[in-house]
């Protein structure tokens, strides 16, 4: 039996990070975690491009555009959607998730879902570097692993 795993070594890989500006007091912390993880695992700072978009709903469009350039080994998406009093939350979460998955499948480039979907501001803060770790960092580690796996099958 053969086991194939991706390695968490970012040297020689190129990454794009799409970050939603909405709730930037959270998304900026996710970005810090992602950049730190990429650099600690050997990525060159010049091989990391960060693109800011207005909100989570706009993430899939930009992620797909970046993946289609064939410049990147992986695209990381970062955003924060916090439940409010209306159904807007449900639409944004569902469409962002669906759009990101469709973009990855249609381009053949790993696009990592790093969009927080939380019930409260407190939950978002916990996932941006306090109690529950930093989901931006976790997304970057997943991007490195998937980029290496993807190279295995080219």
Swiss-Prot record:
Binding residue positions for 5-amino-6-(D-ribitylamino)uracil: 22, 56-58, 80-82, 113
Residue sites binding (2S)-2-hydroxy-3-oxobutyl phosphate per the record: 85-86, 127
EC number, UniProt record: 2.5.1.78
Record field: catalytic activity: (2S)-2-hydroxy-3-oxobutyl phosphate + 5-amino-6-(D-ribitylamino)uracil = 6,7-dimethyl-8-(1-D-ribityl)lumazine + phosphate + 2 H2O + H(+)
Keyword set includes Phosphoprotein: no
Any one GO molecular-function label of the UniProt entry: 6,7-dimethyl-8-ribityllumazine synthase activity
Keywords: Riboflavin biosynthesis, Transferase
Pathway: Cofactor biosynthesis; riboflavin biosynthesis; riboflavin from 2-hydroxy-3-oxobutyl phosphate and 5-amino-6-(D-ribitylamino)uracil: step 1/2
Catalytic residues (positions): 88
SUPFAM superfamilies attached to this UniProt entry: Lumazine synthase (SSF52121)
CDD domains registered for this protein in UniProt: Lumazine_synthase-I
GO terms under cellular component: cytosol; riboflavin synthase complex
Coiled-coil region(s): none
GO BP of this protein: riboflavin biosynthetic process
Primary enzyme class: transferase
Disulfide topology: none
Stated family: Belongs to the DMRL synthase family.
PANTHER family: 6,7-DIMETHYL-8-RIBITYLLUMAZINE SYNTHASE, 6,7-DIMETHYL-8-RIBITYLLUMAZINE SYNTHASE DMRL SYNTHASE LUMAZINE SYNTHASE
Function: Catalyzes the formation of 6,7-dimethyl-8-ribityllumazine by condensation of 5-amino-6-(D-ribitylamino)uracil with 3,4-dihydroxy-2-butanone 4-phosphate. This is the penultimate step in the biosynthesis of riboflavin.
Subunit comment: Forms an icosahedral capsid composed of 60 subunits, arranged as a dodecamer of pentamers.
Name used for this protein in its record: 6,7-dimethyl-8-ribityllumazine synthase
Organism of this sequence: Bacillus pumilus (strain SAFR-032)
Lineage: Bacteria, Bacillati, Bacillota, Bacilli, Bacillales
The gene coding this protein: ribH
């Amino acid at each position: 039996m053969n086991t194939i795993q991706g390695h968490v070594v970012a040297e020689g890989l190129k990454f794009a990070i799409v970050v939603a500006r909405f709730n930037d007091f959270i998304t900026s912390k996710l970005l810090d975690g992602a950049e730190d993880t990429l650099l600690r695992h050997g990525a060159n700072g010049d091989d990391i491009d960060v693109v800011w978009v207005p909100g989570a709903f706009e993430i899939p469009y930009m992620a797909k555009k970046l993946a289609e350039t064939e410049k990147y080994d992986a695209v990381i998406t970062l955003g924060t959607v916090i439940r409010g009093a209306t159904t807007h939350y449900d639409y944004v979460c569902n469409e962002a998730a669906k759009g990101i998955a469709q973009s990855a499948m249609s381009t053949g480039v790993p696009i990592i879902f790093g969009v927080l979907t939380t019930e409260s501001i407190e939950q978002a803060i916990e996932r941006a570097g306090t109690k529950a770790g930093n989901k931006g960092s976790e997304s970057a580690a997943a991007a490195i692993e998937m980029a290496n796996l993807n190279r295995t099958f080219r």
